[in-house]
Amino acid sequence: DDRRLAMFEGVYSVPDGVSYNSYLLLDEKTVLFDTVDEAVQKVFFENVAHTLAGRKLDYVIVQHMEPDHSATLEGILMRHPEAVVICNKKTEAMIYQFFGADLKMNVQIVGEGDVLKTGRHELTFLMAPMVHWPEVMVTYDITDKILFSADAFGTFGALNGALFADEVDFFADYLKEA
């Protein structure tokens, strides 16, 4: 949770803060889905290291380049230079625009319907341009039927420790904004 912001990107009022959603899949291969904003980088890096528990990070899937999803990508790659960055062609160009042409990374470009097998899990990539940026893609875990949706279904507001939909009161927490 990030409650330090009054305005998100200097445009949107966020009186209830924001949350940054990055996910780590532990399988035969480890996969990080997006990163987070620099404001919470210290705890993010600590959480990733703790969850990996000494394992290497195999993949970083970059679904969206907005800074609240990607600002700590360079820091992750410095800590895990072995990680392969999975992204689409538009995202690759944007990564170098954001972080500079000298950023060291191993890249695997994916397109619509491509599949990455991580062990038990099979991840398929679906392009979702203009969810609100042109490079957005989402990742679907075929095995567990989970959609990692980038910004497609996002909302503002800190989660107050909640991780799952059934841990929040929809009417009290979200309907008031509608």
Residue spans of the language-model regions?
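Zn-dependent metallo-beta-lactamase
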Residues: D1-K29
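Active-site environment of divalent metal-dependent phosphoester hydrolases
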Residues: R3-R4, M65-S70, A93-M94, H132-W133, ...
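Divalent metal-coordination and catalytic microenvironments
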Residues: L25, D34, H64-E66, T139, ...
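Active-site beta-strand termini and strand-to-loop segments that position acidic
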Residues: L25-E28, T118-G119, D141-T143
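Active-site metal-binding motif and surrounding structural segment of the metallo-beta-lactamase
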Residues: E28, A39-I86
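Residue-level marker for buried hydrophobic side chains located in beta-strands
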Residues: V31, I61, I146-S149
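Metallo-beta-lactamase
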Residues: C87-A178
